[in-house]
Amino acid sequence: MSAEPAAWTTIARRTVVEDQWIPLRADDCEDTSGRSIAPYYVLEYGDWISVLALDGNDDAIVVEEYRHGAAIVAIGTIGGGVEPGESPEDAAARELLEETGFESDDLIGLGATWANFGNHTNRVHHFLARGCRRVAEQSLDDGESIAVHVLSLDGLGDRLSQSHHQLTWYKAMDWLGR
């Protein structure tokens, strides 16, 4: 029978890269049996949000954009980073407006999950936005090119290729009883 898992001890920690896009550190660790695990790389991102937005007809408002890491153009939920001092709820409302020009008076928190607890420090906060209506034009960051689509919920989960986008969809479908 194997030993019970236990937290490692961090012996040393150093920043490897820190710029506007990637905060990477290297930890030198030791497990409870004294084995060295070094370096262990950790990405220190801030929290993210993921929003499944529905219009008044319960159709999904989704975004489509190029994702360079995977080298694909993909459909996804509305998402982005939580700014310092901003609540996840405020970030969800802000990203919905910026990426799509839509807003909702019924933003429902669906819980949070770890982005990747193996080597990320951040969580993904999942939201359902109901009764969304277009109130503005998109307000995109430099380098963003995002198409907005209104699609049926039927089969949408199969079209979402990012894991936390799928999880947001599943959590929303569960909340809606579908």
Placement of each model-derived feature along the sequence:
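A short coil-to-beta-strand element that immediately follows conserved catalytic motifs
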Residues: 9, 103-110
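Beta-rich strand-turn-strand
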Residues: 85-90, 99-106
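Active-site-adjacent beta-strand/loop module that shapes the phosphate/pyrophosphate-binding cleft
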Residues: 25-33, 117-135, 149
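Acidic, metal-coordinating catalytic segment for phosphate/diphosphate chemistry
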Residues: 11-50, 56
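Acidic pyrophosphate-coordinating catalytic loop
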Residues: 15-20, 113-124
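Nudix hydrolase/Nudix homology domain
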Residues: 2-8, 73, 84, 113, ...
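Conserved Nudix-box catalytic region and its N-terminal flanking loop in Nudix hydrolases
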Residues: 3-7, 43-45, 49-94, 142
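Short loop segments at secondary-structure junctions
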Residues: 32-34, 55-57, 66, 129-134, ...
